[in-house]
């Protein structure tokens, strides 16, 4: 593997080399040290594979994965790669099966990923076949450890990664439980192609500073302003975060007008204001919560719009974002209508998040030829801890703290 030439400058995580988003050798190392390393990769929802034989195909980084429930009701995950010649084992996005068979040479696997059958293993009429020394038990796709937390299914290639609860930490666990405290149903899906390196989008998710500056909808309709009550939680590793806020319609705030911020635009109006009409369902008054888990999982609650997002790298300058919109299984008909309508707020063409799908590409294009220069990530200081305010980049610095540890690029004393 070619060695990365990334050079970090300074004694903090406030300077990030632009080359980190364009260096192909570094991207190759990410696959081994992060996605196949000591992390928990989000794979799917437990409710997406409710019965024996139900499966989904997904990815851990670039590695294709099969996730399936067996007759023992346990969930198993293994590489979607035939042990014979490397073809995909499962071609469908989802389905139900008693077993898997590769279409190329008909090698078969059970629902736990064990190789169970080799076509013409003994040959034909005494000719050919596999050698007597061939042992099916010694061949098969690599298997992942599986952990389920609040209906979220995670997988890891590492035997050394902590339990999912310890990996997340108590504050992140509590905030996931806050949203996923009862059974959910999938009510919609999108897959979005992003014209940028995966890290640019994950920074964006963690960046509470940008939200009311980039997104006109957030600011104009006062769904999210930095002046609102809220805060940022960063776990001890730095890799996981929560940003949250509460709408206060009675609070007068002219700070955006005073600074002539573009995103505060009184001429921007809705023909159908019912889009903003919802219902109270969380006793803490939090109207927006964005939660991320390293390296690529997001859980959102924006008003009554609940969704999970899975971020996957596809090349050095492109990534894929899978959106899965959720409702609670006990939603009333009216509540479900509200969730479906508010799905227009957040998504590839959402009134709020459409800009996020573009701005990463603006950065990817803007840093061409600047690999030896640095991004400045100093809003709110140089620490990576939790914050009572959201005019900060603390959780972005936390991401780089975790990233550098996994990549072996920590700051030198």
Curated annotation (Swiss-Prot):
Temperature dependence comment: Optimum temperature is 30 degrees Celsius. Approximately 60% of maximum TPADO activity is observed at 15 degrees Celsius, and activity is completely lost at 50 degrees Celsius.
Entries under Pfam families matching the protein: Rieske, Ring_hydroxyl_A
Regulation of its activity: Inhibited by EDTA.
Gene Ontology biological-process entries: phthalate metabolic process
Cofactor: Fe cation; [2Fe-2S] cluster
EC number: 1.14.12.15
A GO term, aspect molecular function: terephthalate 1,2-dioxygenase activity
Record text on cofactor binding: Binds 1 [2Fe-2S] cluster per subunit.
Keywords from the UniProt entry: 2Fe-2S, Dioxygenase, Iron, Iron-sulfur, Metal-binding, NAD, Oxidoreductase
Enzyme class: oxidoreductase
Chain sites annotated for binding [2Fe-2S] cluster: 82, 84, 102, 105
Catalytic activity: terephthalate + NADH + O2 + H(+) = (3S,4R)-3,4-dihydroxycyclohexa-1,5-diene-1,4-dicarboxylate + NAD(+)
Rieske domain sequence ranges: 41-144
Gene3D superfamilies xrefs: Naphthalene 1,2-dioxygenase Alpha Subunit, Chain A, domain 1, Rieske [2Fe-2S] iron-sulphur domain
Family annotation (PANTHER family): CHOLINE MONOOXYGENASE, CHLOROPLASTIC
Function, as annotated: Component of the terephthalate 1,2-dioxygenase multicomponent enzyme system which catalyzes the dioxygenation of terephthalate (TER/TPA) to 1,2-dihydroxy-3,5-cyclohexadiene-1,4-dicarboxylic acid (DCD). It can also use 2,5-dicarboxypyridine (PDC) and 1,4-napthalenedicarboxylic acid (NDC) as substrates, and preferentially uses NADPH which is the physiological electron donor.
Record's subunit section: Heterotetramer composed of 2 alpha (TphA2I and TphA2II) and 2 beta (TphA3I and TphA3II) subunits. Part of a multicomponent enzyme system composed of a reductase (TphA1I or TphA1II) and a two-subunit oxygenase component (TphA2I or TphA2II and TphA3I or TphA3II).
Similarity-based family: Belongs to the bacterial ring-hydroxylating dioxygenase alpha subunit family.
Name of the molecule in the record: Terephthalate 1,2-dioxygenase, terminal oxygenase component subunit alpha 1
Protein species of origin: Comamonas sp
């Amino acid at each position: 593997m070619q060695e990365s030439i990334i050079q970090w400058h300074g004694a903090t995580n406030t300077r990030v080399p632009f080359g980190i988003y364009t260096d192909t050798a570094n991207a190759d190392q990410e696959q081994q040290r992060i996605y196949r390393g000591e992390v928990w990769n989000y794979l799917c929802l437990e409710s997406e594979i409710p019965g024996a034989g139900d499966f989904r195909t997904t990815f851990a980084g670039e590695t294709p994965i099969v996730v399936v429930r067996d007759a023992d009701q346990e969930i198993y995950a293994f590489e979607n790669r035939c042990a014979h010649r490397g073809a995909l084992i499962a071609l469908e996005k989802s389905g139900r099966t008693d077993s898997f068979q590769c279409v190329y040479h008909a090698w078969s696997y059970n629902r736990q990923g064990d190789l169970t059958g080799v076509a013409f293993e003994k040959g034909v009429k005494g000719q050919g076949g596999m050698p007597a020394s061939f042992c099916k038990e010694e061949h098969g796709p690599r298997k992942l450890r599986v952990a389920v937390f609040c209906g979220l299914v995670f997988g890891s290639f590492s035997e050394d990664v902590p339990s999912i609860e310890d990996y997340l930490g108590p504050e992140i666990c509590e905030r996931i439980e806050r949203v996923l405290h009862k059974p959910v149903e999938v009510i919609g899906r999108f897959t979005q192609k992003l014209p940028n390196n995966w890290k640019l989008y994950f920074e964006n998710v963690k960046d509470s500073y940008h939200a009311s500056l980039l997104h006109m909808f957030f600011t104009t309709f006062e769904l999210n302003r930095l002046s609102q009550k809220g805060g940022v939680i960063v776990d001890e590793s730095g890799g996981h975060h929560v940003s949250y806020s509460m709408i206060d319609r009675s609070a007068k705030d002219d700070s955006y007008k005073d600074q002539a911020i573009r995103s505060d635009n009184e001429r921007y109006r809705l023909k159908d204001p019912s889009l903003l009409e919802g219902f109270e369902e969380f006793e803490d008054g939090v109207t927006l919560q964005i939660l991320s888990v390293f390296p690529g999982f997001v859980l959102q609650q924006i008003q009554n719009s609940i969704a999970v997002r899975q971020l996957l790298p596809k090349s050095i300058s492109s990534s894929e974002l899978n959106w899965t919109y959720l409702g609670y299984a006990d939603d009333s008909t009216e509540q479900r209508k509200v969730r479906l309508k508010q799905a227009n707020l957040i998504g590839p063409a959402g009134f709020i998040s459409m800009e996020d799908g573009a701005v990463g590409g603006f950065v990817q294009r803007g840093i061409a030829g600047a690999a030896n220069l640095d991004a400045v990530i100093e809003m709110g200081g140089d620490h990576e801890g939790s914050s009572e305010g959201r005019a900060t980049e603390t959780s972005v610095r936390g991401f780089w703290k975790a990233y550098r540890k996994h990549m072996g690029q920590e700051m030198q004393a």
